[in-house]
A protein has these predicted regions:
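A structural motif corresponding to the C-terminal end of an alpha-helix
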Residues: 74-85
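General secondary-structure edge motif
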Residues: 13-14, 81
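Active-site activation/catalytic loop segments of kinase-like enzymes and analogous catalytic loops
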Residues: 8-9, 15-76, 94-109
Length: 131
């Protein structure tokens, strides 16, 4: 929530039950951060993305990226890897993107983007586990 008058910003995430404490698992919060920074969730929800399906059910997608996006993403992943298994974070991130689909049913292009990124993340993790 943003209270512009009092210059106050509060984050509330109704994550449900995740983790063994009332505060949940910190990996979920890290995945939410990666979901935003690397995955481009906010960019997509702000309309800075195009997505379409071609004849062979291929999803074509373009997401606006600031000049330093790749560097920031790489740096965040390095920070994550210092403390957690990046594949576990990517798994949660992929599930976060997939879980957004029903919440954005009024915007098919956005759903395509979320679906595509979610499946990409899950495939990245599954491909690593089969090696």
């Amino acid at each position: 929530f943003c209270d512009f008058k009092n210059k106050n910003f509060k984050l509330i995430d109704p994550r449900g039950k995740w983790g063994s404490t009332m505060f949940g698992d910190l990996k979920y919060d890290v995945a939410k951060l990666r979901h935003s920074v690397v995955g481009g969730f906010d960019t997509i929800t702000n309309g800075l993305c195009t997505a379409s399906i071609s004849e062979g059910n291929h999803i074509a997608m373009k997401i606006f990226e600031p000049k330093n996006h790749q560097e920031v993403s790489k740096y965040l992943d390095e920070l994550i890897q210092n403390q957690w298994n990046l594949n576990e974070i990517k798994l949660i991130e992929g599930l976060l993107f997939i879980s957004m689909l029903p919440l954005h049913k009024d915007h098919f292009e956005r759903q395509l983007a979320f679906y595509s990124i979610g499946i990409q993340r899950l495939n990245e993790v599954l491909d690593k586990t089969s090696e």
